[in-house]
Amino acid sequence: MWGDHSTKRQHIDILAVVMIVVAVRKFIFVCCCLLAAGSALAQAPAYTYRDDHDPDGTGKFYAGREIAQVMGHQGADWLERPERQQEERPDILLQSLPLRPGEVAADIGAGTGYLSWRMAQIVGDKGRVYCVDIQPEMLDLLARKMAEHHTTNFQAVLGAVTDTHLPADSVDVVLMVDVYHEFDHPYEMMQSILRALKPGGRVVWVEYRAEDPEVPIKPLHKMSEAQVRKEAALLPLQFVEAIETLPRQHILIFKKK
């Protein structure tokens, strides 16, 4: 009988040790999660607000820059203006993209699809272009543009101000043309873009040159290379190259780490 009691006591002691180990591991796991979350929050720059601000801005500031107002769908004709071909040279832009046949691209702030259908031609039938916009009216115009060019290898996506609503690990190249400076929540939006990018995927910023006073665009709708790189440095992105072949815009390419 004594042996039976001793064996039971040993089993109880072992069970108690196992329970303690499990509890300690859970505690450590929770602490690590909290530390990681705290670290992420610490790294994310805070948004600030000012009542006295540029009339073309939102009064919301990020990384030392005022966020510009979004161009509404009422201004869609400006995206399709005939002179855009010479002012922005989309042909040169598309030749500069790290985009190949069969790949998946995302046109963020696709608008009327001015660039989307051209990108669809590059990736071909085996590729796909996600056309993301937060305005349903823009996506309606985009659908007409795609039909006009008999483009079928695309998917229109209604995004939100904090989320592209793109599938995770689905995109090779993300293109943002004259849109990033209007993101209401740039940090959250870029986190969403990074989730959608495949490992090693590329993000391409195209913005009017703030360094050039001759570029006839309102100041808040321009960005300097230094400002783009400053904000990209807050994210797990590696700078690849700056291409300055466009008449008025930077092409800044980054790679997901």
Briefly describe each language-model feature range.
Residues 106, 110-163:
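Class I SAM-dependent methyltransferase SAM/SAH-binding core
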Residues 44-104:
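Class I SAM-dependent transferase core
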Residues 240-241, 245-257:
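Core SAM-dependent methyltransferase catalytic element
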Residues 172-186:
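A short SAM/SAH-binding and catalytic strip from SAM-dependent methyltransferases
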Residues 30-38:
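Bacterial N-terminal signal peptides
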Residues 120-121, 187-202:
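A short glycine-rich, Lys/Arg-flanked "PGG" loop and its adjoining helix->strand segment in the class I
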Residues 164-173:
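A short acidic, Gly/Pro-enriched loop at the edge of an enzyme's catalytic core
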